[in-house]
């Protein structure tokens, strides 16, 4: 019985006060300000997060809010809020940034380790996004079925508040959180079933990302519990399972059954080959199981969302596919990953007889989704819908060196991210689009022609795009010749273990 309580029982010592430090502890503002400046987000060029709020302005807004009327969600005028005035959207966004920093403090590994007097083990290799793909290469070739899951986001802001209730001790911070979500829900209508998670997080990425991660954490804790204890829960109905009050009674009954040596009656469905991978709002559940059991997991996930999280069950949320002969490719983290068979003919000779042996080996393919990537380039105004490069008119005011440097950084980031592709032709097409778009942008700025500009510039622009790749290959293969390095660049895979954020052009969904 204690084993199940470890998974499901709420630890009251983990609850925290969030609104009190926001109002009365001044060091919170400095901490939030420094955290915002030190947080980096991968944009098109790998830029840093732009912190628009200062600690002094946040403190003034908090004081103004505290001295005015009590917090009220219902406002008489949609244009003027009784707390913030006409700039309610801007002020609420600034305060919510600091509120997000306060909420993140108890969950900071560095802070918890400091308070406990422990050191954080440095393992940067396990933090890289690219570390997932060697895992795919090692595991997918031995698996049969995969569940392609798009985790639903809550359709009502109250679901996010209820998820956070287990970690919050003071009710006033929950009211403040409801106020922020009410502002976003009324002004932008973000929390709707039609929008993706990227749109859901666009207005205030820091606070909503924390709330969404809390929502996903609750979902995954139940999912992992079911995976670990599925042998004990085969006869448990779903509605009884998610209600913790009735769950313990069911478990006690099952313990009595096991005590009477009736284990043979209850078949074991625990799968040791089940693998789970998630990034943002998409997850993959792969297994060597039969399609019948995988279909059961599919309907179980749908029921979990409907009954426990009150999320809408849209068609296509969970798709069951068979990993066979490259007919299905997993669209995950900007790559199309699939399993294909490689045939290898071996001639064997025994005495006077010779015969051929056909050996088939499964191999994981990782390719570039060129159609989606060109769509991202089109949306960013680097090319048209047909993939023809166009000039970047919004960058015409930059200097030549700054404009070229921007294109080189974008090309370098994409080249590094897709270095693990098994087919590089699509990647070279993307680099060609960026290179020619850079030339056309310079031509438009100087009011010249492409031929005249290239004739005057020569091969200097081309060297800017290739210099970074030659430098990386020289570090990886110092003794190899230049020809062999370029051959490996075209044929081999290179996974970088320092890529922590997905590029905006890669994240096209």
Swiss-Prot record:
Main location group: plastid
One of the GO BP terms on file: mRNA processing
Coiled-coil residue windows: none
Single GO MF annotation: RNA binding
InterPro entries: Domain_X, Maturase_MatK, Maturase_MatK_N
HAMAP family: MatK
Family assignment from sequence similarity: Belongs to the intron maturase 2 family. MatK subfamily.
Described purpose of this protein according to its UniProt entry: Usually encoded in the trnK tRNA gene intron. Probably assists in splicing its own and other chloroplast group II introns.
The protein, known as: Maturase K
Naturally occurring in which organism (per UniProt): Citrus sinensis (Sweet orange)
Gene name of this polypeptide: matK
């Amino acid at each position: 019985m204690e084993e199940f309580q470890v998974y499901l029982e709420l630890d009251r010592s983990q609850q925290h006060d969030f609104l009190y430090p926001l109002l009365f502890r001044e060091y919170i503002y400095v901490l939030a300000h420094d955290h915002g400046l030190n947080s980096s987000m991968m944009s098109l060029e790998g830029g840093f997060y732009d912190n628009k709020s200062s600690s002094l302005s946040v403190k003034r807004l908090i004081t103004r809010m505290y001295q005015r009327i009590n917090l009220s969600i219902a406002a008489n005028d949609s244009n003027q809020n009784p707390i913030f005035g006409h700039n309610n959207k801007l002020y609420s966004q600034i305060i919510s940034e600091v509120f997000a920093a306060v909420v993140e403090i108890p969950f900071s590994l560095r802070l918890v380790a400091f308070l406990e007097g422990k050191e954080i083990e440095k393992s940067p290799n396990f933090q890289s996004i690219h570390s997932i793909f060697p895992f795919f290469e090692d595991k997918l070739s031995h698996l049969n079925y995969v569940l392609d899951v798009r985790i639903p986001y809550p359709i009502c802001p109250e679901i996010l508040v209820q998820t956070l209730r287990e970690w919050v001790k003071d009710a006033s911070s929950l009211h403040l959180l409801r106020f922020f979500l009410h502002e976003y829900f009324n002004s932008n209508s973000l929390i709707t079933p039609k929008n993706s998670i990227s749109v859901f997080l666009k207005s205030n990425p820091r606070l909503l990302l924390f709330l969404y991660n809390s929502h996903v954490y609750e979902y995954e804790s139940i999912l992992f519990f079911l995976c670990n204890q599925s042998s004990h829960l085969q006869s448990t109905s779903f509605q009884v399972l998610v209600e913790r009050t009735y769950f313990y009674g069911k478990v006690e009954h099952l313990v009595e059954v096991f005590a009477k040596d009736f284990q043979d009656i209850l078949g074991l469905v625990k799968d040791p080959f089940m693998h789970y991978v998630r990034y943002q709002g998409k997850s993959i559940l792969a297994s060597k199981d039969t399609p019948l059991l995988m279909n059961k997991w599919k309907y179980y996930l749908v029921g979990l969302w409907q009954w426990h999280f009150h999320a809408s069950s849209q068609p296509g949320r969970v798709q069951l596919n068979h990993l066979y002969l490259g007919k299905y490719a997993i669209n995950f983290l900007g790559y199309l990953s699939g399993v294909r068979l490689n045939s290898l003919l071996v001639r064997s000779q025994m005495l006077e007889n010779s015969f051929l042996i056909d050996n088939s080996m499964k191999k994981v393919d990782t390719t570039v989704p060129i159609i989606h990537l060109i769509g991202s380039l089109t949306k960013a105004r680097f090319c048209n819908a047909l993939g023809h490069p166009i000039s970047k008119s919004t960058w015409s005011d930059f200097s030549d060196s700054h404009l070229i440097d921007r294109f080189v950084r974008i090309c370098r980031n994409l080249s590094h991210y897709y270095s693990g592709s098994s087919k590089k032709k699509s990647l070279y097409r993307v680099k060609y689009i960026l290179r020619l778009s850079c030339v056309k942008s310079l031509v438009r700025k100087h009011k010249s022609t492409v031929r005249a500009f290239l004739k005057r510039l020569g091969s200097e622009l081309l060297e800017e795009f290739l210099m970074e790749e030659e430098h990386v290959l020289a570090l990886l293969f110092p003794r190899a010749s230049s020809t062999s390095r370029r051959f490996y660049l075209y044929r081999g895979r290179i996974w970088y273990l320092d890529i922590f954020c997905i590029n905006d052009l890669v994240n096209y969904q």
